[in-house]
Amino acid sequence: MFELTGRKALVTGASGAIGGAIARVLHAQGAIVGLHGTQMKNWRHWQLSLETGSSCSRLIWPIETKSRRLVRERKPILKASTSWSTNAGITKDGLFLHMADPDWDIVLEVNLTAMFRLTREITQQMIRRRNGRIINVTSVAGAIGNPGQTNYCASKAGMIGFSKSWRRRSTRNITVNCVAPGFIESAMTDKLNHKQKEKIMVAIPIHRMGTGTEVASAVAYLASDHAAYVTGQTIHVNGGMAMI
């Protein structure tokens, strides 16, 4: 697919369907991968899901409070990371007028503020090396909105704005891009009933949900030398649900 041999990548949100797929695809292309996840209880499963001899590192700390520690501790994969993919995200859905402050705050904290803190830290390492790939996984919801998800949509739209703004400022061969998935097969979509899934399919011209691997392929492209001249962009992986 895209040659990444010898590259070092840090993937947050690796316990989720998309983050996990990104870790596997980057590793399959030769990258040394560091994982961050808050719910990675089955670590043995992760070791077995990657190829024998994996150089995958286990990095599990609360992302919203330990960003400086995560990067600055003596973890070679972090200090030498050439690619950085943020996928950590949560939802706390509710009607806007009834949304409680804590539900707004926690979604913005995990989805947007933690990404800001960690990117600020890891970019310092990239600037010193004059090389880096920052890939923020946002959502189609950040571009078109979604009823009952004011907090989530705001956080994902914020990621896009953050990436564009940082790209305007960043130099030294550092690219900053977003990948915006639509409906992707995951534990979350598995909970939808048949009627809910039918309603979703009507809005997707390809008439199916995407896979984590399809999102991961876009991330692998942006992490590779093939995308060296691509920056400040958002790649939409949504089956035509939103043609932006």
Curated annotation (Swiss-Prot):
GO biological process: lipid metabolic process; monocarboxylic acid metabolic process
Record carries keyword Oxidoreductase: yes
Gene3D superfamilies in UniProt: NAD(P)-binding Rossmann-like Domain
Residues where NAD(+) binds: 11-35
Record-level Gene Ontology MF annotations: oxidoreductase activity
Domain of life: Bacteria
Chain sites annotated for binding substrate: 139
Name of the protein described by the UniProt record: Nodulation protein G
Species assigned in the record: Rhizobium meliloti (Ensifer meliloti)
Organismal lineage: Bacteria, Pseudomonadati, Pseudomonadota, Alphaproteobacteria, Hyphomicrobiales
Annotated gene: nodG
